[in-house]
Amino acid sequence: MHAGSGNDMDITRMTPTRLDDEPDAPEPETREDDNKTLNSPISELEGRLFDQRKVLIFGGINDKIARDVTGRLLALAGTSDKPIDVYVNSPGGHVESGDTIHDMIRFVDSIAPINMIGTGWVASAGALIYAAGRPERRVCLPNTRFLLHQPMGGVRGPATDIDIEAREIIKMRERLNRIFAKETGQTYEKVAKDTDRNYWMSANEAIAYGLVNRIIHSATELK
C-alpha cells in the first residue's frame, strides 16, 4: 500500500506491508544491454525452465516478482493443461505482492495443476504463496524450513491516519491467519497464537502442522 508524496506534516506515508524481517533490498539497476541477452546462458536457462513448465520464486517478494510470476503462469497455462512446478525459496516481502501470486496460483490451477515445491526457506509472504497450492500438491525438499508470523507495516503522518493503517494491518493479520488455518487444518486460535511471534518449522514439523503434504528427494517423485 502506498500513499502519495508531499509534505510529511499532512500526507500519510506508508511503506508496503511486509511479511518478513528483512529491510527492502535496493532495486536492481536497468542497463541498456538488458534487452540484448536473448542468447545469453541466463536466457537459455529461462527458456529451458519454461519449456519444462518450471517457475522459480526465489528471493524477496515484490511487485516485480509478482508481475514476472503472473506472466509465466498465465503463459504456461495458455500453452497446455499439464502440471506446472513452482519452486519457492523466499524470506518473504510485501504482502500485497504475495497476495497477487497466491491468487494467481489459485486462478491458474483451475486450468493446469500446480505443484508447490519448498526449498531452502519458505518464510512469511513466501509461505503465503506456498499455501496457495492444493494440500496434496504441496511438497518440499528435506532441509526446507518454514516461517509463519504476523505482517508488519510502517507509517507516519497524522494520528488519525496512523490509526486507520494500524486497523488495516490488524484486518490483514486476521485474514492471513484465516488463510493458514484453512490450508493447514489448524484452528484459527492456534494459528493466531503461533503467528504472534516468529513460528519456525522444519520440514517434518510443517507436515505435522498441515502446511506440507510430504518430503520429496528426487524430481521423479513429482506427479
UniProtKB/Swiss-Prot annotation:
Going by the record, the broad EC class of this enzyme is hydrolase
Q: SUPFAM superfamilies annotated for this entry?
A: ClpP/crotonase
| InterPro entries assigned | ClpP, ClpP/crotonase-like_dom_sf, ClpP/TepA, ClpP_His_AS
Catalytic function, reaction form? Hydrolysis of proteins to small peptides in the presence of ATP and magnesium. alpha-casein is the usual test substrate. In the absence of ATP, only oligopeptides shorter than five residues are hydrolyzed (such as succinyl-Leu-Tyr-|-NHMec, and Leu-Tyr-Leu-|-Tyr-Trp, in which cleavage of the -Tyr-|-Leu- and -Tyr-|-Trp bonds also occurs)
Provide the primary localization: cytoplasm
Localization: Cytoplasm
Domain of life per record: Bacteria
The active site of this protein is located at: 124, 149
Q: Where is the composition biased (Acidic residues)?
A: 21-32
EC number(s) recorded for this UniProt protein: 3.4.21.92
GO BP terms in the entry: protein quality control for misfolded or incompletely synthesized proteins
One GO cellular component this record assigns the protein to is: cytoplasm
Please provide the record's keywords in A-Z order.
Cytoplasm, Hydrolase, Protease, Serine protease
* Subunit relationships: Fourteen ClpP subunits assemble into 2 heptameric rings which stack back to back to give a disk-like structure with a central cavity, resembling the structure of eukaryotic proteasomes.
Concerning HAMAP family, the annotation shows:
ClpP
What this chain does, per the entry, is described as: Cleaves peptides in various proteins in a process that requires ATP hydrolysis. Has a chymotrypsin-like activity. Plays a major role in the degradation of misfolded proteins.
> Can you name this protein?
ATP-dependent Clp protease proteolytic subunit 2
Recorded source organism is Gluconobacter oxydans (strain 621H) (Gluconobacter suboxydans)
